[in-house]
């Protein structure tokens, strides 16, 4: 795609002591694009996400978001805030990612106060209502504490909160994995609607290939810190070329599927986790 | 085949903030020796509570009605030695193995405890059998594993240790409560293959609890779908996905994205799943059902036989064959 890139990472590497969690990862996200990072526990996919948002500093490599370098940690609050306005993240667990004392209104308003100093109280209230409507929360739900809300409703707050900073890129770190099937479909539809109505780009971190198929255009498959396969989502899932991608694909339950003991049953997992 | 486990009109209430809340309502199911039965549902549907009631592990203060019979014996009446024997015959595997193992005791201590307590086996023999059981679930070097602590093992490996441990008492029925939900997909496939193989080789019956309709369909002979504390459909697993009897089953199948194609919009079910105590009068699913009529909201339908399955829907017969059709138009 020749579109403008909103995010580009080159040669990304992260070592924790002797352990190399991420090893030479390149990725690029075009404006309005949607990229999946697929992998299992320990593949390094979440570490990549953390480096992009700035929760971990890369050992090597560069990250450029919206044309600005963010490879080194932000210096000062102003720089951090600016970066927050470019890339936001929605975590997996809506039970632990929200402040239990803040209603949705307070949680979203807090972000607006930080990122939109141009807005007065009235403008912020209007924006909170607008975001509430975008994510499908009614007036009562917006005023309730997270405790009184279901997992799906809480995840809607987390999404509204991320969008309040007007980011160019939202990282969805397993953001629908913990939701019930019927709620997961609602949130996936919501994410598709938001993408249609705004200029936003997504990076979806997921192990769920069906979810990846539904909301991303491109995919990279990670295994032990490295990218083993990349391409268009439909193409990679329909015609996986690498053995690891083929194994992932074959492990997904579907009608007529028979679980099989893989070749690594007695070998690879023998190592200490 | 006579049933190994029979559950009839099971109802359960749990004390929450000083009042008793209904969590199960009229649950009936049976499992024959060697049979695998799936129990599928979303949060609060009562699937775990059903397994806990069968295992006699309901939280304290819970009230249960109805009958649970294992091999003809009334499970509610078991106590002392009888209950201990029962716990050897009916084993449970949980979702999070790390929450069900003592972190400061070795794998060996954990594995032989049940064997020594329930079966009176001496330590040396118990350890030998533990090593053999580890080999059965694909873990080599069992002797070394017995000396390790839970934190030294990955989630998938620890779950296989749990399965090996449960095998030691040679149970006739295994209650597996989301045993692979916390595992990676490739590990899930392995753990499921192991459970499936053991079941076939040893004739163990399996009650497999999951939120994943496809997974239940792949490993179970029959599957029951639960909603708001009741079973709404029981059917041959192979038919559940393509030829469901209940609107809820049909919408569960189509709400999930598939790996083979993306759709413009998923056929999401409006609202959220409710627990038994929140369920309205009449059919519990009616507020979210595309086919609900006034009569659905007026009285709760009984569960009835239809086309070789059981279904709890007042309109099941007239909707026969139309459930998947409508949903396809949706998508």
Predicted regions and their residues:
Chain B
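P-loop NTP-binding/switch modules centered on Walker-like glycine-rich loops
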Residues: 56, 175, 179, 183-264
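Conserved ABC ATPase signature
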Residues: 148-153, 157
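ABC ATPase NBD coupling module
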Residues: 59, 75-91, 109, 117, ...
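Conserved ABC transporter NBD signature motif
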Residues: 63-74
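A short, proline-enriched helix->beta-strand linker immediately N-terminal to the Walker B motif
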Residues: 168-172
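Short catalytic/signature loops enriched in Gly
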Residues: 20, 140-146, 234-331
């Amino acid at each position: 795609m020749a579109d403008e890139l909103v995010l580009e990472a080159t040669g990304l590497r992260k070592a924790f002591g002797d352990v190399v969690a991420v090893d030479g990862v390149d990725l690029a996200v075009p404006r309005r694009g949607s990229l999946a990072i697929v992998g299992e526990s320990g593949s390094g996919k979440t570490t990549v996400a953390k480096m992009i948002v700035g929760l971990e500093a890369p050992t090597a490599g560069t990250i450029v978001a919206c044309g600005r370098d963010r490879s080194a940690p932000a210096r000062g609050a102003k720089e951090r805030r600016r970066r927050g306005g470019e890339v936001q993240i929605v975590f997996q667990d809506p039970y632990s990612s929200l402040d239990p004392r803040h209603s949705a209104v307070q949680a979203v308003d807090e972000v607006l106060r930080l990122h939109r100093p141009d807005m007065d109280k009235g403008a912020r209230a209007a924006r909170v209502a607008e975001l509430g409507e975008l994510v499908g929360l009614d007036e009562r739900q917006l005023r309730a504490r997270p405790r009184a809300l279901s997992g799906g409703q809480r995840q809607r707050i987390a999404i509204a909160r991320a969008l309040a900073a007007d980011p160019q890129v939202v990282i969805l770190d397993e953001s629908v994995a913990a939701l019930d099937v019927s709620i997961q479909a609602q949130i996936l539809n919501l994410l598709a609607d938001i993408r249609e109505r705004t200029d936003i780009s997504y990076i979806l971190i997921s192990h769920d290939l069906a979810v990846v198929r539904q909301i991303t255009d491109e995919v990279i498959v990670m295994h032990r810190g490295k990218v083993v396969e990349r391409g268009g989502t439909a193409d990679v899932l329909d015609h996986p070329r690498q053995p690891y991608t083929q194994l992932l694909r074959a492990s997904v339950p579907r009608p007529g599927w028979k679980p099989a003991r893989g070749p690594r049953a007695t070998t690879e997992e023998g190592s200490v986790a | 085949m006579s049933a190994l486990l029979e559950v009839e009109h099971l109802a359960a209430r749990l004390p929450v903030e000083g009042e008793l809340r209904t969590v199960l309502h009229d649950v009936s199911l049976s499992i024959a020796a060697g049979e695998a039965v799936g129990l599928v549902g979303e949060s609060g549907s009562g699937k775990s509570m059903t397994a806990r009631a069968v295992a006699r592990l309901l939280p304290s203060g819970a009230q249960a009605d109805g009958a649970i019979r294992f091999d003809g014996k009334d499970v509610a009446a078991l106590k002392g030695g009888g209950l201990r024997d029962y716990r050897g015959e009916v084993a449970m595997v949980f979702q999070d193995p790390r929450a069900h193992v003592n972190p400061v005791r070795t794998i060996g201590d954990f594995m032989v405890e049940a064997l020594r307590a329930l079966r009176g086996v001496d330590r040396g023999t118990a350890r030998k059998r533990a090593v053999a059981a580890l080999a059965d679930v694909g873990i080599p070097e069992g002797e070394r594993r017995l000396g390790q602590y839970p934190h030294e093992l990955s989630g998938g490996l620890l779950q296989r240790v749990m399965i090996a441990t449960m095998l030691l008492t040679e149970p006739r029925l295994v209650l597996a409560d989301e045993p692979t939900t916390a595992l990676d997909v490739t590990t899930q496939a392995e753990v499921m293959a192991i459970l499936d193989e053991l079941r076939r080789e040893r004739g163990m019956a399996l009650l497999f609890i999951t939120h994943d309709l496809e997974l239940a369909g792949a490993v179970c002979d029959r599957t029951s779908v639960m909603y708001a504390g009741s079973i709404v459909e029981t059917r041959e697993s192979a038919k559940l996905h393509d030829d469901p009897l209940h609107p809820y089953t049909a919408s569960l199948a189509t709400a999930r994205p598939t790996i083979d194609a993306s759709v413009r919009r998923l056929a999401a079910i409006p609202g959220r799943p409710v627990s038994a105590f929140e369920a309205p009068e009449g059919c519990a699913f009616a507020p979210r059902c595309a086919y609900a009529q006034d009569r659905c909201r007026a009285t709760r339908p009984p569960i009835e036989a239809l086309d070789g399955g059981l279904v709890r829907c007042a309109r099941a017969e007239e909707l026969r064959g139309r459930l998947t059709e409508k949903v396809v138009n949706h998508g």
